């Protein structure tokens, strides 16, 4: 398994995801979304699995400030890559598989 957790340091669900993998002694790589973001290829891979809507955090302040609800889908994608704080976290990848949020039932099937 090649687990990557894309998250935010203050995100409760990201901490729960890290703990879940630690308890099972599964090695993972943590990537801080606000500082590193997702590469365009990583983004496309995750979007293909979970869909665009699942990736966007509609409850964050940046969503309102950038008027995300009122712009075209293409412009939303550009903003999402430009402002990584818009991502829902944690984004957990295992090769080509991906989840958004705390999904231990799905991760257990990866083992």
Where do the PLM segments sit?
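Local sequence-structure signature of Cys/Sec-based thiol-disulfide redox active-site neighborhoods
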Residues: 1-24, 28-33
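Thiol/selenol-based redox catalytic cores and closely related redox-interacting motifs
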Residues: 33-111
């Amino acid at each position: 398994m090649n687990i990557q957790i894309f998250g935010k340091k203050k995100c409760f669900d990201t901490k729960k995801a890290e703990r879940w993998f630690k308890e099972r002694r599964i090695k993972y790589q943590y990537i801080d979304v606000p500082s590193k973001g997702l590469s365009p290829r990583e983004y496309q891979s995750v979007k293909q699995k979970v869909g665009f809507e699942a990736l966007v955090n509609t409850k964050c302040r940046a969503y309102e400030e950038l008027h995300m609800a009122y712009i075209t889908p293409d412009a939303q994608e550009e903003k999402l890559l430009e402002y990584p704080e818009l991502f829902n976290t944690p984004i957990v990848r295992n090769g080509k598989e991906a989840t958004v949020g705390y999904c231990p039932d799905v991760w257990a099937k990866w083992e």
